[in-house]
């Protein structure tokens, strides 16, 4: 809702007890790429609330569902703030209880920097367009993941906003299985490409020579 639309609703909300306007943050993605690596967020489920030992989540909260969003949920979510407000008989805010003595400001989530090279990631996705497969590029010296491509993939923007449920169901029913992260969940024989690494290991350990065993 726009600020103007919210203003109209707020003027009439006192007539509808139990209804209120709640702000929430919606993820924005700078690139239409790396959907499998980044993951997505969605409304917390009853099962996730039961598993929440801290009691942090309530109905309507959003939580990381897949990928980095899920793995680093506790770091990205921040901490909730608390405001105790006084209202009149019509539900209109009159001020803060005890002048805000028991209020607590919210704490924003931490920033997370990935090792993904977005140019390399987008190149990999272009190379696998209309194909089935995966590409993983790893920096040998550090072990950093430079790209993590799974194809078919999907636009991460499909998993935000009010159409998330509809879009997720559409992707789930797709016979090409775009939700499957083939780079991590697929099992494929390495084939002849593995012989190069195996041969170098043998040479390094002195097991064989360049001419043969």
PLM features: what roles do these ranges have?
Residues 145, 193-203:
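Extended, hydrophobic alpha-helical segments in both membrane/secreted and soluble proteins
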Residues 1-165, 187, 204-212:
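Periplasmic/cell-envelope proteins involved in peptidoglycan metabolism and beta-lactam response
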Residues 113, 168, 172-194, 211-213:
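Short active-site loop at a secondary-structure junction
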